[in-house]
A protein has these predicted regions:
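Conserved "HGTGT" condensation-loop signature of ketosynthase/thiolase-family condensing enzymes
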Residues: 1-236
Length: 236
């Protein structure tokens, strides 16, 4: 039976240390938040909160904001980390940390001494919400923690590295990309999706595939696919 392991302690601590090296300790302490795995099982609630609290203690973080998109969507399995990322992008854009509204109170066994787990939507103050830690806490050792930096912080770094002139040119070129993205979003919101679906078109005629003892010849490709001829087991 799978159970929590030490892996997530490692990934979470290394992710925070990485962010400290990039953005500085004060930005991490005052400007980061956690997008928890938050699968809401009894073991997950207790063990994940303990990881966050102990990492917070190690890096002198207080009142670390925690949210969990699964409280809205449930566990979408494979796409779950994508759900978390989309949620973080929303926090960056709107400055609102979604509350965990699926519970009436935080269970007493959850160690949240250094955490802030809002049960209602929370408006972040200026300077907060600059760094997101996306946590994946799979029982049995499948653990990962991703670090996502806000557009504001990223733009700050780009200006510092490339200068104002180069950054202004980038912003000018990016306007067209934004217009296209906004147009697509508007169309998608209206259900106007022109999906490209070309099943079987421009494919390879399977009858023209040639197979012999030396290899396989595929129409449209100059070189054939040859078989491996090295004898890996000479004693056989």
């Amino acid at each position: 039976i799978a159970s929590p392991g030490p892996g997530n302690y490692i990934t979470m601590a290394k992710a925070v240390a990485s962010a400290v090296s990039m953005a500085g300790i004060e930005t991490v302490q005052k400007g980061s938040f956690i997008q928890a795995h938050g699968s809401s099982t009894p073991k997950n609630c207790v063990s994940e909160a303990d990881i966050f609290d102990r990492v917070a203690q190690a890096f002198s973080i207080r009142d670390w904001p925690v949210t969990a998109v699964k409280s809205y969507l449930g566990h979408s399995l494979g796409p779950a980390s994508g759900d978390q990322l989309i949620g973080c992008l929303g926090v960056f854009r709107y400055g609102i940390l979604p509350g965990i509204k699926s519970v009436s109170h935080i269970a007493p066994q959850v160690n949240n001494a250094r955490l802030t787990i809002p049960l209602q939507d929370c408006k972040l103050e200026e300077g907060q919400g600059q760094i997101a830690f996306i946590n994946s806490k799979g029982f049995g050792g499948n653990n990962a923690t991703g670090v996502v930096y806000s557009p504001k912080l990223t733009h700050q770094w780009l200006r510092k590295r490339y200068g104002e002139t180069v950054f202004a040119n980038y912003q000018q070129r990016n306007r067209q990309v934004r217009r296209q993205a906004n147009a697509y979003d508007e169309a998608a919101s209206q259900g106007e999706l022109n999906v490209i679906y070309r099943f079987g078109q421009q494919g390879i005629n399977e009858e023209d595939i040639k197979i012999d003892m030396n290899g396989i010849t595929i129409p449209g490709f100059e070189k054939p696919i040859t078989y491996a001829t090295d004898k890996q087991y000479p004693d056989f």
